[in-house]
A protein has these predicted regions:
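A conserved position within tetratricopeptide repeats
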Residues: 1-5, 11, 25, 32, ...
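Structural helix-adjacent loops and short alpha-helical linkers that scaffold large soluble proteins
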Residues: 31-47, 94-109, 150-162, 208-225, ...
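Alpha-helical junction/boundary sensor with strong preference for TPR arrays
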Residues: 35, 57, 98, 118-121, ...
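Extended ligand-binding clefts on enzyme/binding-domain cores
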Residues: 82, 121-124, 132-262
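Extended ligand-binding groove/face enriched in aromatic
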Residues: 20-22, 27-140, 181, 320
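Well-ordered alpha-helical segments within folded domains of soluble proteins
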Residues: 16-32, 77-95, 134-150, 190-211, ...
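CBM-like carbohydrate-recognition segments
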Residues: 2-17, 59-64, 75, 216-323
C-alpha cells in the first residue's frame, strides 16, 4: 500500500495494490510455464503475494465501501466481487503451478461464494461497489477464477462459466463495435450512452483468453479494428469514436494523443497470447517511449514504475501471457 500514490485516495490505493499483487502473481505463474526451472521460487513469491492480499490492511478499502469485511462475510449476500475474485484467481494460479493444499479450504469458500452470489443475482453479474454499475472487466476476473477452479475440481462451476459466456455473446455486445460493453446495469442491460472504452475492452480480451480462446480472438480482432492507432505512438485508443488529445481517466491513466496507457498495456497480453508479433513489437516500442526502461543491478524495469508500480506488474504479466 505504501508504494501506491497518495493522491489517488484510499480506495484506489487499495485497488491498485490488489491489482499489483494479482498481476504480479499472473506474471509469476506465466513464467513458471515458460521457464519451469523457476517454478519453486515463483511459487514462494505467489504465496507471499496471496498473504499480502489476505492482510486486513489491503482488504480494508473493500470493507470500507461495503461496510463489512469481505472474508468474514462469505456466508452473506453482498458482492465484494472484485476483491474476492482477484484473491481466488491468485490462489488458482498457486494451485495450477503446483502449490500445496494450504489454501484449499479458502479457495473452496471463495469460489462457492462467488458462484452462489452470481446465480442469485438479477443478471449473473455483481457490482464492484454498492450503488454502482457492473464493471464488465471486474466480472471477468470472477469468471476466470471459476473457470480455473473447474479445471482443478472436475468441472465444478463450469456451468456458471458457460452460462455467463453465452449471455455475453448474445446480450452484452456493443452494437457498433461488436465488443463486449464496458458497463452494465444491475439488471444486465447495457447503457445506451455509456462509452465502450479501450482500456476495458483490451482487459476484457485478455481475460477471455483464459476462458474461451475463440471468443477472445474474435474480440481481439474487433479491438484492433476499432481502437488501434498506428504511427509513431502505436497503441490502443481510449475512445474509438472521438479524439482526446489530453485527458485523464483513473482506469486508463493519462490519455495523450488519443492513446490509452492501460489499454495499450493490456493489449500486449492478447498480442502475446495470439503471437501477433508485429503488433506486439509496436506496442512494446510505445511502452518503452512512455515508460523508459532502465538497468539497475542486472535488472531492468520501467522508470515510470517509480510513480505507478501497478503498470510494471501489468506489463510483466502481459509480456509473459501464454496459452
Amino acid at each position: 500500500l505504501c508504494e501506491m500514490p497518495e493522491g489517488i485516495g484510499t480506495q484506489f490505493q487499495g485497488e491498485w495494490a490488489l491489482y499489483s499483487c494479482s498481476m504480479l502473481a499472473a506474471a509469476l505463474f506465466n513464467m513458471s510455464k515458460l521457464y519451469p526451472e523457476t517454478k519453486t521460487e515463483n511459487l514462494e513469491n505467489i504465496d507471499n503475494l496471496i498473504e499480502m492480499v489476505l492482510s486486513f490492511e489491503l482488504r480494508k478499502y473493500d470493507a470500507e465501501r461495503w461496510g463489512e469485511d469481505p472474508l468474514e462475510t462469505l456466508d452473506g449476500d453482498r458482492s465484494h466481487i472484485s476483491y474476492i475474485s482477484h484473491l481466488a484467481w491468485m490462489i488458482s494460479e498457486y494451485k495450477m503451478a503446483g502449490g500445496n493444499d494450504k489454501y484449499n479450504n479458502l479457495f473452496d469458500d471463495l469460489c462457492g461464494t462467488m458462484n452462489r452470489r452470481l446465480l442469485r443475482s438479477k443478471s449473473l453479474n455483481l457490482p464492484t461497489y454498492p450503488n454502482e454499475c457492473i464493471y464488465v472487466p471486474d466480472m471477468l476476473v470472477a469468471i476466470v477464477a471459476l473457470n480455473n477452479y473447474s479445471k482443478l475440481n472436475k468441472g465444478k462451476y463450469i456451468s456458471t462459466v458457460r452460462k455467463w459466456v453465452r449471455k455475453a455473446k448474445s446480450e452484452w455486445l456493443d452494437k457498433e463495435t461488436g465488443l463486449l460493453v464496458s458497463f452494465l446495469s444491475e439488471d444486465g442491460i447495457p447503457f445506451k450512452a455509456a462509452p465502450v472504452k479501450g482500456s476495458y475492452s483490451a482487459l476484457n480480451c485478455l481475460y477471455l483468453t483464459q476462458i474461451d480462446s475463440v471468443f477472445a480472438r474474435e474480440q481481439y480482432h474487433r479491438l484492433k479494428s476499432h481502437f488501434l492507432q498506428s504511427g509513431l505512438l502505436f497503441g490502443i485508443r481510449e475512445y474509438h469514436d472521438y479524439s482526446c488529445w489530453l485527458g485523464f481517466d483513473i482506469d486508463a491513466g493519462p490519455v495523450l494523443f488519443n492513446l490509452s496507457p492501460s489499454g495499450t498495456a493490456f493489449a500486449v497480453g492478447s498480442a502475446t497470447y495470439f503471437n501477433d508479433v508485429r503488433v506486439r513489437n509496436n506496442f512494446l516500442r510505445t511502452a518503452e517511449i512512455a515508460g523508459h526502461s532502465v538497468m539497475w543491478n542486472n535488472t531492468r524495469h520501467y522508470l515510470l514504475a517509480e510513480i505507478a508500480l501497478v503498470g510494471e506488474c501489468i506489463m510483466l504479466a502481459m509480456r509473459t501471457t501464454t496459452p
